[in-house]
Amino acid sequence: MKGILNVGNTCYFNTSLQCLVHVPIIKSLFVERGYNGPCSFTKGFSEFTRKYWDDSLKITFNVNNLLGEFVNKFPRFVVGRQHDAQEAVLCIIDILENSVPELKKHFYGKKIQETIWPGGKKTHEEIFSIHILTSTSTSLGEMMRNSLKWNVLNDYEDDDGKVHHVATTRCLF
């Protein structure tokens, strides 16, 4: 069994690391290839990932050096204070994808917004992580399904500047 030493309100960081090393592409990339680039955080993360998945090691990890590198890049994560694990995960992903650009295609997909009005149709494609519309639901699946539903737009202006009384739009993932 393996764990990460909590040195006072570092559970957000420890949890973030544990989540990310279980992402198959991250595990595969850093265990099989490692990282030899200039980013000291990514070097430390790569080493941590390799050791984490080394079955011969049954240890508790001290990630203070890695945490220090993280705080150097994101000073708002003051050591000793409570922080949000989701925010830390996104910041770690930001570091990793800048160090290893091929990771971007695994963390981001495409969102296609489709808008239809009388006499026309337009699609707009953009890279995204995930978009969920605000909802009172507690079910992630329901929130995702609701994000795909058609919405009515009143007085929609198309790319040619023509205003249409009504149009419908939806996002496709």
Indicate residue ranges for each PLM-predicted region.
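UBL (ubiquitin/ubiquitin-like) substrate-recognition surfaces
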Residues: M1-F173
